[in-house]
């Protein structure tokens, strides 16, 4: 890019551009030029690649052609959305001076900075997902982490103690933009994330952070927020708040408090668990066939976002959970009436954020009015619900009759997109505005009267009075009659077949009309800004109302799901344990074309580990995951897919289910598996729910079996966690005989000829057969390979003389038995082809074999 070194050689306009660009060197600068935003030099080259737009040249400056790319101002939101989705930030530079009075370039300034984590515009946001700005800080004692949803004002901080917990927080929150200090040591935690922003160290200083936060909240200290003793979290929060203020170029009145998130308040799930349980994102990265896809039939975007937050942070406070359960039960008879009305409320939460930022558009205010219009009916319907929590929500949502009346009087029914287009303020709201509009709108009548009068006065039947945007008002006479034009007609424009004229009276009226239009638009903008001033004093109450409406939407949705999907209300018990009668997988049962086979589960301190065996495809992983999902659903207060559930305290959910190579970090499948296993063994407690699926794959058979055995022993004897341990190592089925609290269960299958039918039914005891070859045949492995595999299996089974004693049906050899040396007689028989022997040779072979025994 052209530099400041040859600054004086540039044109005045480019000097202005370069000054503004120097203030924002690392982000794209959209420089307003008439009806376009233009980008120059390196910005133009980057934008042409990112947006797939043409790269051209705009004249020359300092003797060099200027690379240039441009986008129409009316389409800017679409282009901003593309850039934000790619993690880019953009400074929007507008003309603020009057071209008519400017000497030199029109005055311009950057009015806002659009970044992935600070957007609030409707067109740039995913309506059913939170969009978070985050900051991360680290010192010798651990991490500090803060998140802000600028589109709602929700401000949170936490202090993850270690790397694994920090990784889980990043996975849970998935920020659109992440600020980090220039000396941040754990770059491998955040590398590859979108929207990374390196910030100077001084922005994370604790004293600056306290000062920033107290100034924002109007407080002398932070004790009332419960964050005073969270220095690492405050360092992150201070940097984050300063960045938000810098980018928004305005106050942030909707950010009124900050909340500390503590590990002990919610069930902890690490990054692997969130991924494996497919809570809001499936393993392929999509949203289909996830828990959220089944549970989320909310009717407002803000309700959908709240439900997803609940799913990722199950609460441990049973008082909160029992209140939600009671509310869901009370609402089940009212869902059909409430959901259509709630649907009309829309995304009040984000509209209020735009109001606070003074970026709300006319249609935002119209939607706010529409939301207010639903409140009387909602409150009337809720009055009939016999539930104290529901009545508390009813009071919290308010009614706002005065604000509804204000917006009904002030804003027309269907306003334009932008206030600068005019026609936003309703007739009758302001007398002066009505007068200016009457003058501007009366032009049509005046022109018709003038045309009739001038035709009669001149006798010219081709005379017409009209208007265009370039030349203004005119009197047009055909070429054939133009020589008869009166002497007071002054020629304004010559056309091929006509002449256009102006007269003093029409010129005077034109000035008056154009002045009235300008004054009407200026007054309309002023009145629109005054509406903000009238609404903003109610912002806190409005935010509480939006929160109550979102929570009501979530609870009504969960009530509808419970009724429609035949869920039951779980019971919380004081001791560790999970007892499920006829449990079902909430997602799998929705995608199956046949009835789902429900299964029981019983975990308690006396039966704390289940060794699960059975064939591949038999349903072991489904059974394990459904247990975790039922527990998760219970701990958000939801009803669950089962006939009956009793569930005790849970502090963490761990899953070691499936794995893939982590090529980016140079870790094999086995290394990933062992890392996840180590995390479980270090952090699980007797109150944890642990899912372990086929530990020990990816290494030698004996290594794998030994690791699986030791892990199972540790979980059952030392940690005493509630554990579901699926395995194909049949030796592990001996564990119940060797230690207390361990039991065998299995999923069975039936073979008929070359076909296999999976029963998907959980039974007590160990499986008797692995069915591996049958599953391989089902998958389409060639018959000759299956045939050879059966032959090899018989050979392997014959190696151990103890195999028959270990496995009655002879289908699985004991891996812990020591193979004996093969008998020479057996070896000779294996190499013998009976069909090729003559009677004499056969007799000789009998004597030879006799000598070998």
Swiss-Prot record:
SMART domains: MUTSac, MUTSd. GO terms for biological process: mismatch repair. ATP binds at residues 614-621. GO terms for cellular component: cytosol. One of its GO terms (molecular function) is ATP-dependent DNA damage sensor activity. Keywords: ATP-binding, DNA damage, DNA repair, DNA-binding, Nucleotide-binding. The keyword Nucleotide-binding applies. This protein is involved in the repair of mismatches in DNA. It is possible that it carries out the mismatch recognition step. This protein has a weak ATPase activity. Belongs to the DNA mismatch repair MutS family. NCBIfam families: mutS1, PRK05399.1. This is DNA mismatch repair protein MutS. It comes from Escherichia coli O1:K1 / APEC. The lineage of its organism: Bacteria, Pseudomonadati, Pseudomonadota, Gammaproteobacteria, Enterobacterales.
């Amino acid at each position: 890019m052209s530099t400041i070194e040859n600054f004086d050689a540039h044109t005045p306009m480019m000097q202005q551009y370069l000054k503004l660009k120097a203030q924002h060197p690392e982000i794209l600068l959209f420089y307003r030029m008439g009806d376009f935003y233009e980008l120059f030099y390196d910005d133009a080259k980057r934008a042409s690649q990112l947006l797939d737009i043409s790269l051209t040249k705009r004249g020359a400056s300092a003797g060099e052609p200027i690379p240039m790319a441009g986008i129409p101002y009316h389409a800017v939101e679409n282009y901003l959305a593309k850039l934000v989705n790619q993690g880019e930030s953009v400074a929007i530079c507008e003309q603020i001076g009057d071209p008519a009075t400017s000497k030199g370039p029109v005055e311009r300034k950057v009015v806002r900075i659009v970044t992935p984590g600070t957007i609030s515009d409707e067109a740039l946001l995913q309506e059913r997902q939170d969009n978070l700005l985050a900051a991360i800080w680290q010192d010798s004692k651990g991490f500090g982490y803060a998140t802000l949803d600028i589109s709602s004002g929700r401000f949170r901080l936490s202090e993850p103690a270690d790397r694994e917990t920090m990784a889980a927080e990043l996975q849970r929150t998935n920020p659109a933009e992440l600020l980090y200090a220039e000396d941040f040591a754990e770059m491998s935690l955040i590398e590859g994330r979108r929207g990374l922003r390196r910030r100077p160290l001084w922005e994370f200083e604790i004293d600056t952070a306290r000062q920033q936060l107290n100034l924002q909240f109007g407080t002398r200290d932070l004790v009332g927020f419960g964050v005073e003793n969270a220095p690492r979290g405050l360092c992150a929060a201070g940097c984050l708040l300063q960045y938000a203020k810098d980018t928004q170029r305005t106050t942030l009145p909707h950010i009124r408090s900050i909340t500390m998130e503590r590990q002990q308040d919610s069930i902890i799930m690490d990054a692997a668990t969130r991924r494996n349980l497919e809570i809001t994102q499936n393993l392929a990265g999509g949203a289909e066939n996830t828990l959220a896809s089944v549970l989320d039939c909310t009717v407002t975007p803000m309700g959908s976002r709240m439900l997803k937050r609940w799913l990722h942070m199950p609460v441990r406070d049973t008082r909160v959970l029992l209140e939600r359960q009671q509310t869901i039960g009370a609402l089940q008879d009212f869902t059909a009436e409430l959901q259509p009305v709630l649907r009309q409320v829309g995304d009040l939460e984000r509209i209020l954020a735009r109001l606070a930022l003074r970026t709300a558009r006319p249609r935002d205010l119209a939607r706010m009015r529409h939301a207010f219009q639903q409140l009387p009916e909602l409150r009337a319907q809720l009055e009939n619900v016999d539930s104290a929590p529901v009545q508390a929500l009813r009071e919290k949502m308010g009614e706002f009759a005065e604000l509804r009346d204000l917006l009904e009087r002030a804003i027309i029914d269907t306003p334009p997109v932008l206030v600068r287009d005019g026609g936003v303020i309703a007739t009758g709201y302001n007398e002066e505005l009505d007068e200016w509009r009457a003058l501007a709108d009366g032009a049509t009548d005046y022109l018709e009267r003038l045309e009739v009068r001038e035709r009669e006065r001149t006798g010219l039947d081709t005379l017409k009075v009209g208007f265009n945007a370039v030349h203004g008002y005119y009197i047009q006479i055909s070429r054939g009659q133009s020589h008869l034009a009166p002497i007071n007609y002054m020629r304004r424009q010559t056309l091929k077949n006509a002449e256009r004229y102006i007269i003093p009276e029409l010129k005077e009226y034109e000035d008056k009309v154009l002045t009235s239009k300008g004054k009407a638009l200026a007054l309309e903008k002023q009145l629109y800004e005054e509406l903000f001033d009238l609404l903003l004093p109610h912002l806190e109450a409005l935010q509480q109302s939006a929160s109550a409406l979102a929570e009501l939407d979530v609870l009504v949705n969960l009530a509808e799901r419970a009724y429609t999907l035949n869920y039951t209300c779980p019971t919380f018990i004081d001791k560790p344990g999970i007892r499920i009668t006829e449990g079902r997988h909430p997602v799998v049962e929705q995608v199956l074309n046949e009835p789902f086979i429900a299964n029981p589960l019983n975990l308690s301190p006396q039966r704390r580990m289940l060794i699960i065996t059975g064939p591949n495809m038999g349903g072991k992983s489904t059974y394990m995951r459904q247990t975790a999902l039922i527990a998760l659903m219970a701990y958000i207060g939801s009803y669950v897919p089962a006939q009956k559930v009793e569930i005790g305290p849970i502090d963490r959910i761990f899953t070691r289910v499936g794995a893939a190579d982590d090529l980016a970090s140079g870790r094999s499948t086995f290394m990933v598996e062992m890392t996840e296993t180590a995390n479980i063994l270090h952090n699980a407690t007797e109150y944890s729910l642990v899912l372990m699926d086929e530990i020990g794959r990816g290494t030698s058979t004996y290594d794998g079996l030994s690791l699986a055995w030791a892990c199972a022993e540790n979980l059952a004897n030392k940690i005493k966690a509630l554990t579901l341990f699926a395995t194909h190592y049949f030796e592990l089925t001996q564990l119940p005989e060797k230690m207390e609290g361990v039991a065998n269960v299995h999923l069975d299958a039936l073979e008929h000829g070359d076909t296999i039918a999976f029963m998907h039914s959980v039974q007590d005891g160990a499986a008797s057969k692995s069915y591996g070859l049958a599953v391989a045949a089902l998958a389409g492995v060639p018959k000759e390979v299956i045939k050879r595999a059966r032959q090899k299996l018989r050979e392997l089974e014959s190696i151990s003389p103890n195999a028959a004693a270990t496995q009655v049906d002879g289908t699985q050899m004991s891996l812990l038995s020591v193979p004996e040396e093969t008998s020479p007689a057996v070896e000779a028989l294996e190499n013998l082809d009976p069909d090729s022997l003559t009677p004499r040779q056969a007799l000789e072979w009998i004597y030879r074999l006799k000598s070998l025994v």
